[in-house]
C-alpha cells in the first residue's frame, strides 16, 4: 500500500473532518501517498495519516500503512515522546 509521497496543493478536508478547528491549526500538510493524506503535528512531530476518501486512520509501520482506529491515531500524535 505504501508508495511515493506526492506533495502538491494541500488537502485539509480529511483533517478538518477528524479534529476540532482549534486543533487542526497545529498540523502541517506533508503530502499524500496511496490515497492517505499525511499531516505532521508542529510540536510532537508525529504524523496523523487519514484516508482522503474514507476518513480512516493509518499508522506507518514496517514500511507500510496499517489501519488503526481514531483513538489510537490521536493518542499516537499527542503521547509524550520517549527519549
PLM-predicted stretches and their roles:
Residues 1-20, 60-83:
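Mixed-charge, Lys/Arg-enriched low-complexity segments
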Amino acid at each position: 500500500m505504501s508508495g511515493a509521497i506526492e506533495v502538491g496543493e494541500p488537502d485539509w478536508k480529511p483533517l478538518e473532518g477528524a479534529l476540532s478547528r482549534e486543533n487542526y491549526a497545529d498540523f502541517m500538510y506533508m503530502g499524500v501517498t496511496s490515497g492517505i493524506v499525511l499531516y505532521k503535528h508542529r510540536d510532537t512531530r508525529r504524523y496523523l495519516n487519514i484516508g482522503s476518501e474514507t476518513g480512516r486512520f493509518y499508522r506507518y509501520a514496517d514500511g507500510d500503512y496499517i489501519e488503526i482506529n481514531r483513538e489510537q491515531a490521536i493518542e499516537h500524535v499527542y503521547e509524550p515522546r520517549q527519549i
